[in-house]
Amino acid sequence: MCSSDLAPCGVRSLSRWHRDHPYEMDAGGQHFSVGYLPADSDSGMFGGNSNWRGPVWTPVNLLIVRALLQFHLYYGDDWKIECPTGSGRLMNLFEVAREIGARVASPFLRDAAGRRAVYGGAEKFQTDPHWRDLILFYEYFHGDNGAGIGASHQTGWSGTVAKLIQLFAYLTPEAALRAHDMRPMMSTYGA
């Protein structure tokens, strides 16, 4: 997993590498450029709702985790990759899946200062005792800082972070290699 693809809160929808290396083309006498944007679109290109150029989407990360677990069943513990790229850390695919799962869950957890990344600069949700523990499941997340963006009641897909937490709380790498141990848990989140 390239470090420019991996955000603090999961895998970005478009690599941060494209911030400095946008995709560019000329068509119909016009110049088009698509680069990394960690949050909402900065132009009307593609209708203006181009929030696929950098934010983190929970359902995509869930599919990546599922695929990594499936490949881990085939390759086992001995097949390792560097994650993130350039870190020098070698991980098997189960460990990479668990790393992504932990990153997806991280915006909802309090940091050392008691703040949740999901709430960004929304002080009412960060500090008010009546609101600070009411977790909102946003549509997607800022690709650089994990702040929730878009609709704030997307429990249909961002709420699936609970399944990732549950999965990695109970599933061990050893159990993952015994496919029959994993199937009941995998089936509960769409496998």
Identify what each model region corresponds to.
Residues 1-191:
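Acidic, mature catalytic/reactive cores of soluble proteins
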